[in-house]
């Protein structure tokens, strides 16, 4: 029969106690009936957060104190420590000490009975007088928290959550620097440890403070200003992981990265004379106080964490964790705005050619200057670089605003007239077998066009044109920023927008393609031996393509946008319309990749000059077109296909639909074959 105290009430699983009503012996020798466990007047014992190892094995009710009362009665107070619970699969790699639900669950009485330690009692080898007294007394306090290795041995981090950093230690921790994403770290004790100037917490354990390990334990939520109690997590490890993700994401979108070294602070670490990219992101070391902290070796992290921020609150600079003597003024400036715990801030990751001092730097007043005259930064992150390009071009681009589109469009576009002009052009240019193939392709999608447009009224058609113009307004930026020859056409094949590279490649001027200048092209892809045929059919071609007769005087009634069929040779036109019939009402995000031959813009005078200079072309022109490295400049790009009037290309195109799910425009990109 186990000895029990008066207040030691049995639990439901205590098999060593008798049932209610049985007599048990107490210390005085008298017998007393045990309390009924179902008696409502029976005092309730507060449930412990975690039972000790002995009580857990015996299935007894334990308490929060260490050693617990049961272990004291049984003489097991020296070996009383928290029991190990079975962990979930996703927590198998988590340290046991990180799974405590509360902030001080198993750190209650680690320092109980130990004398208070003054800051001057720390020695250089990482031990203190309290540890020596503890070893002499023979008392052993076990812990389930992990131990970290250093050059002198091991140390644990039991009291990491009890540690309270003073202001001076938080802002100037010496050579120690921690990365929040690393669960382990190593410490080199080649240099003497700096003595503390202020006491920490009265409950601080000597074992935890012996090597300053608790100051920079990544599992300590105090280093990140985490309130684990408000996160509603069942375990401390999950709450810490969730808080760390939120901490890393805070302010990431508000800090544009920069490659300019003088606009980065050094809150994580600064460049050292002897160590620039030597350490991996998951580890950090210790150097002498005159040297700087480690530096991340990951360039992606450098771009993410660095940069100039327009918000002074986030622009803590290098004074937050600087280690030199030159940061006095900057330190006083930043104590109000700096975060009260370790945070990922802007860094001074200078290039090898930079003139930035390797020692600690202070924040210059120019870093808080939002003047537009300051040095332009070079952005390496693709997403932010695109935003910077957009902002830099916004001041000098576009003389019109998007609102002008909705005010200027008053009538719908006549797609019916455009299709009639296209059919007339096809009949006059192509042979009957080729015309039949194109007509079959267009006839296959004609019912779909009728079904989608028959319910649209005048307002819908006007809105459709506004959508087209607004989308085209956005594609203008895409065309200007893309170095690939690009054109945008309506669903009828009429050119609506064109890039400069396409004009250089084909010789078609933008004004001619958009119908702002007369079209004098006579090249239909027949070659030099069919120049007479081209001359005989040029007038009919111009008439069939919308009333543009080559022998007529230029005028506003004789100019219209060029059809896509006028830019391709016969086989390419047939293949395009057969592919368009499959994609127009098919996959809304589909695209087509194929090869084609673009027709160069040639007037009658150009065709005559090519025939006369054929011998000179073979000897001289080839040298200007292609060199050892490919095309030489814009002139060489323009000379491609100048002899036969055709440029072999690979092209990719897609169909953009409007709100009525009707094909609205065709976007095409070309790459010439060199």
Curated annotation (Swiss-Prot):
Keyword annotations of the record: Activator, DNA-binding, Gluconeogenesis, Metal-binding, Nucleus, Transcription, Transcription regulation, Zinc
CDD domains: GAL4
Gene3D superfamilies per record: Zn(2)-C6 fungal-type DNA-binding domain
Pfam family, one: PAS_13
Subcellular location: Nucleus
Principal location class: nucleus
GO biological process: cellular response to starvation; gluconeogenesis
InterPro entries, per database record: ERT1_acuK_gluconeogen_tf, PAS_13, Zn2-C6_fun-type_DNA-bd_sf, Zn2Cys6_DnaBD
DNA-binding region(s) in UniProt: 52-80
Ranges of Low complexity composition bias in the record: 149-163, 348-366, 529-540
Assigned GO CC terms: nucleus
Composition bias type Basic and acidic residues, residue spans: 14-25
The keyword Cell membrane belongs to this UniProt entry's keyword annotation: no
Annotated Polar residues bias: 120-148, 269-278, 285-294
Chain residue ranges for the region called Disordered: 1-46, 117-181, 250-321, 344-374, 519-557
Molecular function terms from GO: DNA-binding transcription factor activity, RNA polymerase II-specific; RNA polymerase II transcription regulatory region sequence-specific DNA binding; zinc ion binding
Family to which this protein belongs: Belongs to the ERT1/acuK family.
Function: Transcription factor which regulates nonfermentable carbon utilization. Activator of gluconeogenetic genes.
Protein name as catalogued: Transcription activator of gluconeogenesis PMAA_028970
Lineage of the species this protein comes from: Eukaryota, Fungi, Dikarya, Ascomycota, Pezizomycotina
């Amino acid at each position: 029969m186990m000895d029990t105290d008066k207040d030691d009430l049995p639990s439901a699983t205590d098999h060593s106690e008798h049932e209610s009503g049985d007599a048990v012996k107490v210390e005085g020798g008298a017998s007393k009936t045990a309390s009924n466990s179902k008696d409502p007047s029976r005092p309730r014992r507060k449930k412990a957060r975690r039972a000790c190892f002995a009580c857990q094995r015996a299935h007894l009710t334990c308490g929060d104190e260490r050693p617990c009362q049961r272990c004291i009665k049984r003489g097991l107070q020296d070996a009383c420590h928290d029991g190990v619970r079975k962990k979930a699969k996703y927590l198998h790699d988590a340290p046991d000490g990180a799974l405590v639900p509360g902030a001080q669950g198993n750190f209650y009485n680690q320092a109980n009975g130990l004398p208070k330690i003054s800051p001057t009692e720390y020695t250089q080898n990482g031990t203190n007088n309290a540890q020596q007294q503890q070893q002499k007394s023979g008392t052993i306090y076990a812990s389930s928290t992990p131990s970290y290795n250093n050059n002198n041995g091991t140390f644990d981090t039991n009291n990491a959550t009890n540690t309270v950093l003073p202001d001076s230690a938080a802002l100037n921790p010496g050579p120690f620097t921690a990365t929040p994403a690393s669960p382990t770290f190593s410490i080199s004790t080649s240099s003497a440890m700096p003595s503390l100037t202020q006491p920490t917490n009265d409950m601080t354990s000597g074992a935890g403070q012996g090597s300053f390990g608790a100051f920079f334990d990544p599992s300590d939520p105090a280093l990140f200003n985490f309130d684990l109690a408000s996160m509603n997590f069942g375990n401390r490890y999950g709450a810490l992981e969730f808080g760390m993700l939120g901490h890393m994401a805070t302010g990431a979108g508000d800090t544009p990265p920069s490659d300019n070294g003088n606009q980065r602070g050094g809150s994580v670490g600064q460049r050292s004379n002897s160590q620039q990219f030597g350490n991996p992101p998951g580890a950090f070391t210790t150097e002498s106080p005159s040297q700087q902290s480690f530096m991340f070796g990951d360039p992606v992290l450098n771009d993410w964490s660095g940069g100039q921020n327009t918000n002074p609150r986030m622009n803590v600079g290098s004074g937050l964790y600087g280690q030199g003597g030159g940061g006095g003024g900057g330190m006083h400036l930043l104590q109000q705005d700096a975060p009260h715990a370790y945070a990922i801030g802007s860094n001074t990751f200078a290039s090898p050619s930079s003139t930035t001092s390797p020692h600690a730097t202070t924040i210059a007043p120019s870093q808080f200057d939002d003047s537009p005259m300051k040095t332009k930064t070079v952005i390496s992150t693709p997403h932010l670089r695109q935003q910077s390009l957009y902002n830099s071009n916004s001041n000098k681009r576009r003389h019109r605003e998007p609102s002008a589109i909705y005010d200027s469009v008053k009538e719908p576009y006549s797609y019916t007239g455009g299709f009639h002009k296209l059919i007339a052009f096809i009949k006059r240019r192509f042979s009957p077998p080729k015309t039949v193939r194109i007509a079959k392709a267009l006839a296959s999608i004609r019912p779909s066009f009728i079904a989608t447009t028959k319910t649209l009224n005048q307002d819908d058609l006007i809105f459709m044109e506004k959508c087209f113009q607004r989308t085209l307004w956005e594609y203008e930026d895409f065309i200007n920023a893309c170095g690939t020859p690009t054109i945008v056409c309506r669903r009828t094949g009429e050119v609506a927008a064109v890039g400069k590279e396409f004009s250089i490649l084909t010789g078609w001027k933008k004004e001619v393609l958009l119908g702002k200048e007369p079209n004098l092209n006579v090249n239909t892809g027949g070659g030099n031996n069919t120049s007479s045929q081209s001359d005989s059919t040029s007038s009919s071609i111009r008439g069939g393509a919308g009333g543009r007769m080559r022998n007529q005087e230029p005028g506003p009634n004789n100019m219209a946008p060029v059809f896509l069929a006028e830019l391709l040779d016969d086989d390419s036109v047939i293949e395009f319309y057969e592919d368009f019939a499959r994609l127009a009402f098919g996959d809304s995000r589909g695209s087509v990749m194929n090869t084609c031959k673009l027709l160069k813009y040639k007037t009658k005078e150009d065709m005559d000059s090519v025939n006369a200079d054929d011998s000179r072309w073979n000897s001289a022109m080839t040298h200007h077109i292609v060199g050892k490295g490919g095309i030489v400049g814009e002139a060489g790009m323009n000379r491609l296909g100048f002899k036969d009037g055709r440029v072999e290309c690979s092209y990719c195109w897609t169909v953009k639909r409007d709100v009525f799910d009707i094909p609205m425009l065709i976007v095409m990109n070309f790459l010439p074959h060199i």
